[in-house]
Design a protein with these regions (language model features):
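Structured alpha-helical subdomains that flank or immediately precede key functional sites
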Residues: 1-200
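Conserved small/polar residues in nucleotide/adenosyl-binding loops
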Residues: 201-208
Length: 209
């Protein structure tokens, strides 16, 4: 369930924003490690158990919910406290838009909790690494990309672009999973066509800056 993770992601963002005095990121974007961190915290459930649409829409639309998240989160910052009522409001907000969280559920004839279901999948988040390719930092070293979606300040291993693509191709051809993070707000991304493009001229221009 994507939205099971998204709910925990927003809770983590709210906490981060509070301790940053309102200077955190309460937007909808994040990176792959956000999923891993939430998975380790709360586990996971199947999509059929928690589809995350508890409002009148066929598709996910968090525009209204995010406005309320910002209002509640920034109110706590201004008041410099998070009261018991604050936590109730936050959880009620997510229950209203995403649905109530399941404590237990039955899947394919077996009963699970979110944590026990995660354990049954045999996934170790420590087995996954994050790679990136930026020209303003040294290659073959880790650094924390300075982008808003990296609000958790996680580090990634920086590779030349061609080598990063070689690693991705090798992983896929040998049966491993690759999760690709991209900026869907860029002009080259098309939801309609399901593709993302970067012009060769644009790419080389950035490499020579």
């Amino acid at each position: 369930s994507e939205m099971f993770i998204v709910r925990q992601k927003y809770l983590n963002q709210l906490e981060d924003n509070y301790y940053r005095g309102g200077n955190g990121n309460l937007g909808q974007g994040s990176l792959s490690h956000t999923w891993k961190n939430a998975f380790n915290q709360v586990g996971i459930v199947p999509e059929e158990v928690y589809h995350g649409i508890n409002y009148n829409s066929e598709k996910h639309n968090h525009g209204e919910m995010v406005r309320y998240i910002n209002a509640l989160g920034n109110t706590a910052v201004k008041m410099k406290r998070r009261s018991p009522e604050y936590y109730k409001l936050i959880n009620n907000l997510f229950d209203t838009y995403l649905g109530e969280l399941p404590e237990k559920f039955t899947y394919k004839g077996k009963e699970y909790t979110p944590k026990s279901f995660a354990e049954s999948l045999g996934l170790n988040m420590d087995d996954y690494i994050e790679l990136t390719s930026f020209t303003h930092k040294p290659y073959y070293q880790k650094f924390s990309p300075e982008v808003p979606d990296n609000w958790e300040n996680e580090q990634m291993y920086n590779l030349p672009l061609d080598e990063m693509m070689e690693v991705a191709d090798y992983a896929l051809t040998h049966g491993y999973t690759v999760c690709w993070d991209g900026d869907v707000s860029e002009k080259g991304f098309s939801f309609k066509n399901g593709v993302a493009t970067v012009s060769y001229t644009h790419l080389r221009a950035h490499e020579t800056e």
